[in-house]
A protein has these predicted regions:
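Active-site metal-binding loops of divalent metal-dependent hydrolases
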Residues: 1, 44-47, 99-101, 147-148, ...
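Core catalytic region of metal-dependent phosphoesterases/phosphodiesterases
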Residues: 5-123
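Intrinsic disorder and flexible coil segments
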Residues: 41-44, 50, 67, 73, ...
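Conserved beta-sheet core of the metallophosphoesterase superfamily
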Residues: 113-124, 128-129, 136-236
Length: 236
């Protein structure tokens, strides 16, 4: 509701932003040249609400203009279209991360994607329900988490414990995080922490609490739907 939040936002607008982002990132990927794999990271509050109550997993009411069944089908179709588009450029890998807005329905979606793409040799969908995920490429170790459940000061230790072998054979380590609806980079214990913003607009709760963000997110390109590009000629 524009007069309440200062921004007009509905499902049509949000879907348009998502599709524009996919096109923009595909253009960026093509500029890179030899990309070996695309990590499609989308489960950071993708569906925003978690089920029939139209609230977050923890029960905070959310604004939505769809019934929960419509929301799931709409979001799922967006994800399928995105993967189909990305796989034209490089093999795609996607996985689950636990987030606080739609922890359950995000997992249902990753399972549906696994079934949908089960016969695709260039699409890998992991249904591991672990709340965090790690990927190693050469001497780079990437950690993915929502950063709602995990305390920031504990994340460096979690990476060392959960990825003992990969920790010992890598030089560069990063966490790609979400949750705070802002873009921030910080180094903690030799690990780079990157918080990525969102392409979503303002809703009642975020506006009431004063969480106002820049309108230039689509221009910058780094968002919750995060693409980690693994280049075969990249030693970082």
């Amino acid at each position: 509701y524009n007069e309440e939040t200062g921004e007009k936002l509905d499902t049509t607008i949000t879907c348009k932003r998502f599709k524009e982002l996919i096109i923009k990132e595909c253009q960026n990927i093509q500029k890179l040249g030899n990309v070996e794999k695309i990590l499609f990271v989308w489960t950071n509050d993708f569906f925003n609400s978690d089920g029939i109550s139209k609230s977050t997993t923890g029960g905070t009411p959310q604004d939505t203009d769809m019934k929960w069944q419509q929301l799931y089908l709409c979001g799922l179709n967006l994800l399928i279209q995105a993967i189909e588009t990305l796989r034209q450029l490089a093999p795609v890998k996607t996985f689950y991360i636990a987030s606080n807005h739609s922890r359950q329905v995000d997992y249902y979606a990753i399972c549906t994607l696994s079934a949908w793409f089960r016969n695709y040799e260039d699409v890998e969908v992991l249904v591991d329900p672990a709340p965090r995920h790690y990927e190693r490429f050469g001497n780079v170790l990437l950690g993915f988490a929502h950063s709602y459940y995990e305390k920031k000061q504990n994340l460096p230790h979690l990476m060392q414990i959960e990825e003992k072998e990969n920790w010992g054979v890598t030089t560069y380590r990063e966490y790609h995080l979400a949750h705070y609806h802002c873009e921030k980079v910080e180094e903690i214990g030799g690990i780079i922490f990157r918080w990525l913003p969102s392409i979503t607009g303002a809703d009642t709760w975020t506006n009431d609490n004063g969480y106002i963000k820049s309108n230039d997110i689509l221009k910058n390109g780094n968002v919750y739907i995060n693409f980690s590009l693994l280049e075969s000629n990249n030693s970082y």
